[in-house]
């Protein structure tokens, strides 16, 4: 026997492959307050036991690899390894299980969503032993939450900046989303803001294209904001999309927005990436800019029920990375969103402390301590007839974003904005008087339409418009 072989034997090293569950499945483990906890929906390949599948997820997303390695002896696996500590079947689904995994906090860089996701939702999602894998929820411990700055300003500071209280905020995405010149784009913004909206918005794919370069758009939109403010006496804003091909260009656009004196910029946080988003969030905090977040690409990640990552995880990640608004489903309208599940992650965005509630898809109690909240944004196929339901379901701390529901008004953009503002004010007034928006909503809108020809015209145009499809995102 060679000296080298003797050395291997003397330290207990045994080459080869062993089952993951022998090391990473630990049902006796008691979770710590400092652990990051994850709930994975696991669909094992035929013949793979759920314990082995859950342990494989824990291993491949923390310290494990496919074979025993020498260097395991140079560190403390008990201190650093992820542990699958509980597995339960998914009711009503064949061969699907929820695997709960605990990760020691020292596995993750402080203040880095990028690093957290690189481990937890990294290569493990391509693992051959699994047919499918979905991250349903994360519990972020207080010790890790406190390493993030979170939203640049938060809900209360935004209301103070805008001097708008006691109602949802109103917005509009300018359409057509692509093809307008900067001057015509600015004109549409002005008409909507003058009509009564609080915000107008760049569409997520408006960056700096040949038909409208970013600097021209910023200038004309700033002119629209100042003109509308002078005429209405209200503070107005336009979400100027600072998303760019590199971080330096993104920050340059945000700097120009600040120099123009506008209140808010925008970022596509999934296509732009978490590192870029956190950098922009820090700039916005330091320079008094609000930050609107669009979730373009989210459905690629979260739409499939058995693979990918649920949006509640992306919402938590955004709150940590930083953003003052984020699009988060409507329940009504044309885009995906089941009511209880949507309200679950809306609470995760807005509230300080959220209790575990499996009926709403919340797998863990989450304490955000002092981190500011994020305003959820409702958009996609909504119009004046949806106003009572939106006001009732989401309350005051939300942004209601009507694109086609403003610009599609038969009389033009400003009357479309007037119709939405009148409908909102009528719903808030009725709610404050104790009326039931769920049962009396249509009547409230009809009463308001008697005094607003703009609202009456909008009601007539969209009276038959419905988007009736079953939600894909169910428990």
UniProtKB/Swiss-Prot annotation:
Record's cofactor remark: Binds 1 Mg(2+) ion per subunit.
A Gene Ontology biological process term: photorespiration
Reactions catalysed, as given in the entry: 2 (2R)-3-phosphoglycerate + 2 H(+) = D-ribulose 1,5-bisphosphate + CO2 + H2O; D-ribulose 1,5-bisphosphate + O2 = 2-phosphoglycolate + (2R)-3-phosphoglycerate + 2 H(+)
Superkingdom of origin: Eukaryota
EC number: 4.1.1.39
Modification N6,N6,N6-trimethyllysine, positions: 14
Name under which the protein is recorded: Ribulose bisphosphate carboxylase large chain
């Amino acid at each position: 026997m060679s000296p080298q072989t003797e050395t291997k034997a003397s330290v207990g090293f045994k080459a080869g492959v062993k089952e993951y569950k022998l090391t990473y499945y630990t049902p006796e483990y008691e979770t710590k307050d400092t652990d990051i906890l994850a709930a994975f929906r696991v669909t094992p390949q035929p013949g793979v036991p759920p314990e082995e599948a859950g342990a494989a997820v824990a291993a491949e997303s923390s310290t494990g690899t496919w074979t025993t390695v020498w260097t395991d002896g140079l560190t403390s696996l008990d201190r650093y390894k992820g542990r699958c500590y509980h597995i339960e079947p998914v009711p009503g689904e064949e061969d699907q299980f929820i695997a709960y995994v605990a990760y020691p906090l020292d596995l993750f860089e402080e203040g880095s969503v990028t690093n957290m996701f690189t481990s937890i939702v990294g290569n493990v999602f391509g693992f051959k032993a699994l047919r499918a894998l979905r991250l349903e929820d994360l519990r972020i411990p207080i010790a890790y939450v406190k390493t993030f700055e979170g939203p640049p300003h938060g809900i209360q500071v935004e209301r103070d900046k805008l001097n708008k209280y006691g109602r949802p905020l109103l917005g509009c995405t300018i359409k057509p989303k692509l093809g307008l010149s900067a001057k015509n784009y600015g004109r549409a913004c002005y008409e909507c803001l003058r009509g009564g909206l609080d915000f107008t918005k760049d569409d997520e794919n408006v960056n700096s294209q040949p038909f409208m370069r970013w600097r021209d758009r910023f200038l004309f939109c700033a002119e629209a904001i100042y003109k509308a403010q002078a005429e209405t006496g209200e503070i107005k804003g336009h979400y100027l999309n600072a998303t760019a091909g590199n971080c330096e260009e993104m920050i340059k656009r945000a700097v120009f927005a600040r120099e123009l004196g506008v209140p808010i910029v925008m970022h596509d946080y999934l296509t732009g990436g978490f590192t870029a988003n956190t950098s922009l969030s820090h700039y916005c905090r330091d320079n008094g800019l609000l930050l609107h977040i669009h979730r373009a690409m989210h459905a690629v990640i979260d739409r499939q029920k058995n693979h990918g990552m649920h949006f509640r995880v992306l919402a938590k990640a955004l709150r940590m990375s930083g953003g003052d608004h984020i699009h988060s489903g409507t329940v009504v309208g044309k885009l995906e969103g089941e009511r209880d599940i949507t309200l679950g992650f809306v609470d995760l965005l807005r509230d300080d402390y959220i209790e575990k509630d499996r009926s709403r898809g919340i797998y863990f109690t989450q304490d955000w301590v002092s981190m500011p909240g994020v305003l959820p944004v409702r958009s996609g196929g909504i119009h004046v007839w949806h106003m009572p339901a939106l006001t009732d379901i989401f309350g005051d701390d939300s942004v209601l974003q009507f694109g086609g529901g403003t610009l599609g008004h038969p009389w033009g953009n400003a009357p479309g904005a007037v119709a939405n503002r009148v409908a909102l004010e009528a719903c808030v007034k009725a709610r404050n008087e104790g009326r039931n928006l769920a049962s009396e909503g249509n009547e409230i809108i009809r009463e308001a339409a008697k005094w607003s020809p703009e609202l009456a015209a909008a009601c007539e145009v969209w009276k038959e418009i419905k988007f009736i499809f079953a939600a894909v995102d169910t428990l």
